[in-house]
Amino acid sequence: MKSSGSARATRRNAVSSSSAPAHAEPPARRAAKSARKLDGAAARPLAPTNAASAKPQGRTREDKDRPLFEDIRYLGRLLGDVVREQEGDAVFDVVETIRQTAVKFRREDDKAAAQTLEKMLRKLTPEQTVSVVRAFSYFSHLANIAEDRHHNRRRRIHALAGSAAQAGTVAYALDKLKQAGDASSKTIKQFFEGALIVPVLTAHPTEVQRKSILDAQHDIARLLAERDQPLTARELAHNEALLRARVTTLWQTRMLRDARLTVADEIENALSYYRATFLDELPALYADIEEALAEHGLRARVPAFFQMGSWIGGDRDGNPNVTAATLDEAISRQAAVIFEHYLEQVHKLGAELSVSNLLVGASDALKALAAASPDQSPHRVDEPYRRALIGVYTRLAASARVRLGEGTVPVRSAGRGAAPVRATPYADAEEFAADLRVLTDSLALHHGESLATPRLAPLMRAAEVFGFHLASIDLRQSSDIHEAVVAELLARGGVEADYAALPEADKLRVLLAALADPRPLRSPYLDYSDLAKSELGVLERAHAIRAQFGARAVRNYIISHTETVSDLVEVLLLQKETGLFEGTLGTPHANARNGLMVIPLFETIADLRNASDIMRAFFALPGVGELLAHQGHEQEVMLGYSDSNKDGGFLTSNWELYRAELALVDLFDERGIKLRLFHGRGGTVGRGGGPTYQAILSQPPGTVNGQIRLTEQGEVIASKFANPEIGRRNLETVVAATLEATLAPHSNAPKQLPAFEAAMQTLSDAAMASYRALVYETPGFTDYFFSSTPITEIAELNIGSRPASRKLQDPKNRKIEDLRAIPWGFSWGQCRLLLTGWYGFGSAVAAYLDGAPDAAERGKRVALLKKMNKTWPFFANLLSNMDMVLAKTDLAVASRYAQLVADKKLRKHVFERIVAEWHRTADALAEITGAHARLAANPLLARSIKNRFPYLDPLNHLQVELIKRHRAGDTNARLRRGIHLTINGIAAGLRNTG
């Protein structure tokens, strides 16, 4: 974070600029003066290093990554300038001294430096503390921007050099399938016709970024990318002035929210990613896919198989702030954003498609569309496309008006010469897309196909993908809430006095009888509890939304904590009571159909083990087959990674998910039903995080089958989708992996699979025993956790609209079982143990190997584990993720957090167990992989993590010091703010949070 006395001598340009010391003159003035000085000089730009002539071959990894580290140093210097300018030399010197001392401690293992660092941090005033924390936090953010830029840069270099397609691209997947003989045109065509891929955006309580910060970072990323282009000296100086201004904006912008985020805020945050990335990049991805298919001899327009989903505004599980009103707010804001996009694009098309029928013909359908337009201007009488588009625009505006109200979406005049009209609204988005297709077809028939490529084709694709709703909103609620509402309806209706107390068989009998009866349970003459009115109100609003915006707007209902068949049937009954269920269930000629698919969410280890039995019993119920037929013989099942991890640990969670998936595949194949799995993955490895590409490819054979939904958790949405180029790459990765996993499932079914699975079962049993012995069976562990991590401080942070825990208000009755899995994982990350991503593996491997009767057998078991790593993607991905987590852990830093535990005996007992298991795990991983250094297979990530530590360490040390003061009764507002700033900075530095 050194202050740059002069501007960086850029590697990308022949001319370098210089500037006076940062504190001597305002940056903008210095940049302007520099530009004037160099204006007229021989500032001929040189080709950037990524020009077409550049070849990636023959260069070392260090050479390839040098631009990344130059960018990090450059941004660090800019930040140093800003700190000195804004806070003065004294604060800058403190920050720089802490940085240098932390680097010395980290790189040289200098114990004296560690003691010096601790003394310095203890002496900081609350004001200095906040400045130091902000400086190190923003450095982490800027380093992330530089890394993202470098990923884009490297991809472009490969493309310019004509390198082979990279893993994670559709082109690579097609090449791989072709080589394996799995890529006939018919097979590929069938895949896309039957595919459904849906990333589902969620708002989780560990998303720590403010939108204002994200906006500034977006500008910094754009300006940094500009520096890869050939720039004149004046342009370079101007670029630096703008970069300096945006870094200054960051410094002068409040990093934390003053008030807890509302659901409305979460809705707006998510919508910002549509504007920045999805609206443009998703249609572009479709075009890329069709181009890749064409290169493989398949020229076809793929259907709208890739769509977007959302939980924001519909996820009520544990969040009383989500209601019918927030559901309404979510769909209204989503619709407003997509209508604004459509209207803007149609308006621009009207300006661009100046095609005259005096020069080229037009189809009869296009002429009819133009004739129906309200535009009667004599200046456009020969311009049928413009006239047609004015008609489309007025109908779009009317469509927005009837759905959202007058004035909700900005609308332009229909054009000069066109009187204000009240056009006929489109019945649905399909009708809008059909009009666009008329324009496209006419252009294609009259030598104008290229005119559709820049804007019309992406707009038509957007209409197919986003409809009038933008993203499908899932509803989610806990099964115990459904039971309470159903029990109330049955009791008030005189059907069953105490439904909740009934055994499962009797519950099903009562539910099926109610579903077979056309009469509703609800009466307008009876009063119901606030809970019942709220829950039924959400479903009633969903019914209205489907009528207003189309069935795709709300089509799924997730049932958290599904433990029995009645948990599913209860939601069918609630749909019946709110108009979402038609006909009667299980009666002849009843034509039963449910508007929302009921989707079980299996979360705990026990529930995962019971998943296939529950679904088998559900399918066997009278009338359910008819419901499935209405759903196209498809059924979705959601699997929870977070709670299963908290319940059974990292290894067992992954293994039980694997087993549950295979059991479900067998059942669904037996019943002739198509299975779609919905993966509830989080940001951390402990919650199913890690590289999406490898995660999908490591799924058990037959479990992907062209269809997949997966959560994009709030805390990693920014890192994946804030940058449009990286956003498109991440979206393509999901498509490529799904394509490979579907058409080449044998790659995850090695010859020795039965032996591998038997070994995994043994490992899982031992790992779960080890994990639960620590977390659930160690006396005092709950106290240790709450003392040694910032969990209570995280709960105070204004991060999300949902509370961190269901039952944490009373410290005397705190239980790990009651803590939500997300802040559980988040807290372990903050203290640099990341326990949820590795604990239990070392003990499991040790038990497996020690269980061998002799040395020869032990050798065979080691060989088997090594072969599992080399030939079984499931196991290899598991170890790769664990390797990454271990690289981010730091036992020395974690020991500082352990000091927060007042009970010395408890502290020593628990921490020593964790340390011993860490070493066992690291040793086991080394024995299996043969790599003793962390991330040996991913040197760029290894260097990235290593270079972050000197900036992360001070944040951790400061966090411990501030927590000590806070818990000792210091009520200084700056101290509390400092704690929350460290939480933000550490999360940014680790690049995955909850």
Curated annotation (Swiss-Prot):
Catalytic residues (positions): H204, K646
PROSITE patterns (UniProt xref): PEPCASE_1, PEPCASE_2
Top-rank EC class of the record's enzyme: lyase
Taxonomy, superkingdom: Bacteria
GO MF annotation list: magnesium ion binding; phosphoenolpyruvate carboxylase activity
Family in the record: Belongs to the PEPCase type 1 family.
Protein name in UniProt: Phosphoenolpyruvate carboxylase
Species, as recorded: Burkholderia pseudomallei (strain 668)
Gene designation per UniProt: ppc
